[in-house]
Amino acid sequence: MLNLPFLRRPIALDLKKPEPSAFPPMSTAEVAVRYHGARIGGDFFDMLSIGDRLIFIMLDIAGKRDFAFHVAATVQVVFRERAEDLFSAEPVNEADAITQLVLAMNRAIMEISGTAHFSTGFAGCFHQSLGTLTYISAGYTPALVRDSHGVQELAANGLPLGLFMHATQDAQMTVLEPGAMLLLFSRGLMEARNRRTEFGIERVRQVLTSSSATSAEGLCSEVLEHALTHMHGRRIDNDLSVLALMRLAAAATALD
């Protein structure tokens, strides 16, 4: 029988928690996150500003909260170290860099868990000057983008993390025009229920379509408040998380 050390979960662990994430100032964009936690679930986000790029991740790690946070703390260290390595030296091939970053996080999840550990995630690289978004959605709920053409869906394009040690993901690219908004939200928010129905992606889409929010923070608050209102005070069984990235309309004049 093969001796594979990463398949043996440690009996006892000094469980850790991830460090708080800072929101870097940007001249042409805004980013915000709103979070409403439950007793279970492992929603986690982090971001770094490296040169003219914002590198960010949003994960939904399966399992009980304490161990999910321990996994998140490990992933955070890997994310910050590898992102600095991959995105600091110009020129940067953003698609290759985000692919390598996701591969490193996938391996970290499996190694710290000692076995397969189902986790979905979204990893993105937003170039502030160009407005390009290079991303991998590893089994995560579909991201939504609102721009002058309406609301488009960025569907998951890769396998969930934590399942296969050497799985690689193909990065995708889109452009956020000035005034465009990117919205990421956790499965817990989409599945928030009242007595009859889930909140669902179509309600998220409706909120985004009709939103008059002028800031990323305002958009996050609006989406979360609609989800909580939909629940009519029912118990929250999973984390509700929302991340919004808004490219400011002023970015158009900044580039002229």
Give residue spans per PLM region:
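… and, occasionally, acidic/histidine-rich disordered N-termini of signaling adaptors
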Residues: 1-182, 232-256
